[in-house]
Amino acid sequence: MSDILSSLAYLTGKPVASAKIKAQPEHFQVREDLGFAFTGEGEHLMVRIRKTGENTSFVANELAKACGVKSKDVSWAGLKDRHAVTEQWLSVHLPKGETPDFSTFLAQYPSIEILATDRHNKKLRPGDLIGNEFVVTLSEVTDMADVEQRLEKVKQVGVPNYFGSQRFGNDGNNLDEARRWGRENVRTRNQNKRSMYLSAARSWIFNRIVSARLENGVFDKFIDGDIAQTSQGLLAVDASNLADMQNKLALSEVEITAALAGDNALPTQADALALEQPFIDEEPDLMALIRGNRMRHDRREIALKPKDLAWNVEGNNITLTFSLDAGSFATSIVRELVNEVKVEREY
């Protein structure tokens, strides 16, 4: 499988070390944080699961069968990796207030555990989470000193907030299909495919812009015409506030953003517009898809700064712990640390 992200720039250059990632499911652990409390009553049974080596959609479908409902009656806040040990909530629409007997379901699938149940007055929807906690083990690391040096840099300034390769499908197939749909003006009622290809299109253009900022030495520097993310919202940067915004960036009070392309004009001006616009112009097929679906322009921070980053070395293995906001990719952190050695998985 080719790496669709291989052309994108690194914060501190391509890693020196190599390592195995997800050599075992336990080497990639994810714990979902919804960030809100359940009401304790309502039409929806909330089920917290821990799954090993299974994807979210499969577990949801099997849980639906166990509850005697249709697959559409089970929902989630976020899809979790198959090749991992992950904890997340699923909601099941059971308006009569019943709690099914899960014993047969659990006996059939030893890779799935039910950790807790609750009740809520609303179903879960994609995006109903504030973030995820990660425990990631890199095994058979070839140059631990370089990895730890890079981790210190990550702790200081973060990493490029790239969308991970999973956003683009196997071998970038989602991106290829997004271009084809835009080129051929494909129309469909399949909301899942439409959403998947639109996400791939916008994510790729964003990644290219972030990479260009790294290549041009302005990943950690505001330029004239930028759009900053502040605690109050988005703010235009120009000559009048450039120095002040740079000082605030150093204090992590504001962040630089890049385009999530839409059918309206970029809000950037001057130097920032000159940097971003070429990546819009060079993808006419992706932009045809985006414009045809009336996606509105949005912004995303270009730096991913993990919270509570720590690590522990045992021999030639290193285990990282950190938290990320929803929508960010742990693989974007790992990419800055090591070159991945492919693992033949039996799970």
From Swiss-Prot:
Presence of the UniProt keyword Phosphoprotein in the record: no
Cross-referenced Gene3D superfamilies: TruD, catalytic domain, TruD, insertion domain
Keywords attached to this entry: Isomerase, tRNA processing
Protein source organism: Vibrio parahaemolyticus serotype O3:K6 (strain RIMD 2210633)
Listed Pfam families: TruD
Cellular component, GO annotation: cytosol
Enzyme class, UniProt record, top EC level: isomerase
Lineage: Bacteria, Pseudomonadati, Pseudomonadota, Gammaproteobacteria, Vibrionales
Protein's recorded name: tRNA pseudouridine synthase D
Domain TRUD: start-end pairs: 158-305
GO molecular-function term, one example from the UniProt record: tRNA pseudouridine(13) synthase activity
Active site residues of this protein: 81
InterPro entries: PsdUridine_synth_cat_dom_sf (IPR020103), PsdUridine_synth_TruD (IPR001656), PsdUridine_synth_TruD_CS (IPR020119), PsdUridine_synth_TruD_insert (IPR011760), TruD_catalytic (IPR042214), TruD_insert_sf (IPR043165), TruD_pseudoU_synthase (IPR050170)
Family indicated by similarity: Belongs to the pseudouridine synthase TruD family.
Record EC number: 5.4.99.27
Function: Responsible for synthesis of pseudouridine from uracil-13 in transfer RNAs.
